[in-house]
């Protein structure tokens, strides 16, 4: 990670040191995930995603101590916030689609604090698909801060589980309220590019950053396909290309697409991925 800015590099080193203080030899791996692992970290915009791997289950006291040491008030995060998940080694290596975590922490100057002390406490309404997909990304793109390479520490999902979690994620996003009207809707660009990432993973088997996935989809020359029961795809791909290009530009300060545009594209992507499972 030679291209990381110094504040983030120092933060990750301090985070691993603090985790080692709490867990000792039970800490067998630490991995940068998300935008850091995918080489797309943007200071001021991105979160810091970290997965820790422990040898054995953690009792509640150690989970609480870990959260106390790593929350923003104790270890200030230089990004929007930290999203940290701790897995047992056997869970990380299992390829399970289930959440399976020991403890989860969200914390930061611009992120609401949240600690979830066990996977069974995670509300289904908040999405249970995140963890299997995150571990799939870690398998391909995780950066080892401590321990063996991420490809050894994390198993990938089976094709059937991957497809199910991708469709679960798209349905979850589609169930959120849609900004009304045809004007620019902040956040719609991430909805479009997130769907691009899912579609590229489904078509090509690789995880890319959101922007790189959008560019890959444009290079495909093949938009999200129309299927029975799905939204009609643009037959030429021009409308899709324009939507993706505007979404990429929005991440650099341009106007985002509208909510209905983003939803229509998400439905196209869902229709293509779900059709393979029918």
Task: Say what each PLM segment does.
Residues 1-31, 61-63, 278:
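Helical scaffold of the NTase/Pol beta-like nucleotidyltransferase catalytic core
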Residues 8, 162-165, 191, 265:
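Amphipathic alpha-helix face/heptad-repeat signature
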Residues 17, 196-199, 214-218:
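Amphipathic alpha-helical segments within well-ordered protein domains
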Residues 32-68, 72, 81-88:
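Catalytic metal-binding acidic patch
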Residues 71-183:
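Conserved NTP/Mg2+-binding pocket subregion across the NTase superfamily
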Residues 166-209:
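Internal helical hairpin/lid segments
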Residues 206-230, 234-278:
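Structured mid-to-C-terminal alpha-helical surface segments
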């Amino acid at each position: 990670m030679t291209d990381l800015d110094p504040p983030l590099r120092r933060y990750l080193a301090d985070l691993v040191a603090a985790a080692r203080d709490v867990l000792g030899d039970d800490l067998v791996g630490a991995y940068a995930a998300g935008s850091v692992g995918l080489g797309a970290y943007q200071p001021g915009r991105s979160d810091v995603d970290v997965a820790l791997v422990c040898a054995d289950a953690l009792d509640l006291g150690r989970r609480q101590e870990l959260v106390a040491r790593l929350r923003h008030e104790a270890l200030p995060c230089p990004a929007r916030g930290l999203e940290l998940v701790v897995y047992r080694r056997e869970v990380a290596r299992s390829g399970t689609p289930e959440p399976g975590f020991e403890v989860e922490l969200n914390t930061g100057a611009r992120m609401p604090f949240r600690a979830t002390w066990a996977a069974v406490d995670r509300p289904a309404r908040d999405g249970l698909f995140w963890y299997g997909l995150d571990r799939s990304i870690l398998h391909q793109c995780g950066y080892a801060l401590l321990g063996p390479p991420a490809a050894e520490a994390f198993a990938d999902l089976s094709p059937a589980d991957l497809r199910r979690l991708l469709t679960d994620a798209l349905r979850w996003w589609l169930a959120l309220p849609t900004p009304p009207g045809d004007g620019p809707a902040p956040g719609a660009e991430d909805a479009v590019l997130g769907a691009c990432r899912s579609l590229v993973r489904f078509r090509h088997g690789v995880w890319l950053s959101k922007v790189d996935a959008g560019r890959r989809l444009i290079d495909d020359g093949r938009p999200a396909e129309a299927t029975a029961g799905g939204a009609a795809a643009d037959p030429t791909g021009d409308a899709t290309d324009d939507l993706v290009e505007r979404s990429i530009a929005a991440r650099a300060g341009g106007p985002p697409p509208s909510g209905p545009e983003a939803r229509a594209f998400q439905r196209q992507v869902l229709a293509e991925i779900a059709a393979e499972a029918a």
